[in-house]
């Protein structure tokens, strides 16, 4: 049993996969035609960020669907409380009310373009912000009420975020307020947590999305008649296994590298056959050194025999087993 877990909700939209007989199979498995190839993931993480399980969801899960996922996490892992982390969702208010009723919590993205005047004015007000020495970031918090529940609003401004927002600002977006460019606002039931801790929890959403995006390019058409839903569920299973392995490895590396850096290094760590029983591992970087150190094998060894490779794999397996004890 665990004291609490986090349920991170994310949605993904993939281009048409070109599956054989895809048109007639599009609705099989519960995918709405209007949603196209949009699906969601509900991933349960422990307090250290290691995945425990995942569920395929609709792209915008309802309060009832989220409540079912929360109940499943409690039943399967003995969690006393579940913190739901989610980005933009049209069902935020209903989900908040359901979580409050079950005694669970949330960290939700709060879109400023549709927020009330009070919240927008508070965000735009320059007072009470804590600014970094470089001036690149500033943050402030307040307690407020959402759906009759006491919440903590936390807003972060970043200079880089502002540049991106202005670059991506659409001319036809009459509702967009340039004064709010660069601001990210989240609301949470966890009023006792610091602003830094809340944004660290919210970043789980970005961390979950990153490895799945890395693998979307590998989503190739099936040569057999198959429903899109079935194909995508298989794709998400592969993504989850890769995500789980990356998380374990990055945990052993003390989270010193992001998923993209580790995945790229692993792809480059190939051995080329030289002659007879010798293989050359020519690629080396600070990231590969950290990976080998975390796996418990010799660092930066360029020449290996087949026996050396098998021995290193066995050493890495034993090292991982010891780490999990």
Regions found by a protein language model. Give the residues of each.
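Anion-binding and metal-coordination hotspots
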Residues: 1-325
């Amino acid at each position: 049993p665990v004291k609490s877990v986090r349920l991170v909700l994310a949605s993904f939209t993939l281009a048409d996969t070109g599956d054989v007989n895809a048109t007639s199979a599009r609705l099989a498995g519960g995918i709405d035609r209007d949603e196209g190839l949009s699906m969601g993931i509900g991933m349960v993480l422990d307090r250290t960020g290691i995945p425990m399980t995942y569920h395929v969801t609709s792209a915008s899960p309802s309060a009832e669907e989220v409540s079912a996922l929360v109940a499943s996490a409690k039943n399967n892992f003995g969690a006393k409380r579940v913190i739901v982390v989610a980005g933009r969702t049209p069902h935020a208010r209903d989900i908040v009310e359901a979580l409050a009723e079950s005694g669970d919590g949330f960290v939700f993205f709060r879109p400023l373009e549709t927020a009330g005047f009070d919240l927008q004015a508070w965000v735009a007000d320059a007072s009470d912000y804590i600014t970094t020495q470089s001036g690149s970031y500033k943050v402030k918090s307040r307690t407020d009420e959402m759906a009759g529940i006491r919440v903590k609003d936390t807003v972060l401004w970043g200079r880089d975020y502002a540049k991106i927002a202005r670059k991506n600002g659409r001319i036809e977006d009459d509702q967009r307020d340039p004064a709010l460019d660069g601001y990210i606002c989240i609301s949470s039931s966890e009023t006792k947590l610091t602003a830094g801790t809340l944004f660290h929890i919210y970043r789980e959403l970005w961390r979950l999305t990153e490895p799945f995006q890395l693998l979307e390019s590998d989503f190739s058409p099936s040569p057999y008649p198959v429903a899109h839903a079935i194909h995508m569920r298989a794709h998400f299973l592969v993504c989850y296994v890769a995500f789980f392995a990356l998380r374990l490895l990055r945990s052993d590396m003390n989270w010193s590298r992001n998923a993209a850096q580790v995945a790229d290094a692993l792809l480059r760590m190939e051995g080329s056959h030289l002659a007879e029983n010798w293989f050359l591992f020519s690629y080396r970087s600070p990231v590969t050194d950290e990976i080998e150190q975390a796996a418990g094998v010799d660092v930066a060894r360029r020449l290996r025999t087949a026996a050396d490779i098998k021995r290193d794999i066995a050493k890495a397996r034993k090292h991982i087993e010891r780490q999990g004890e």
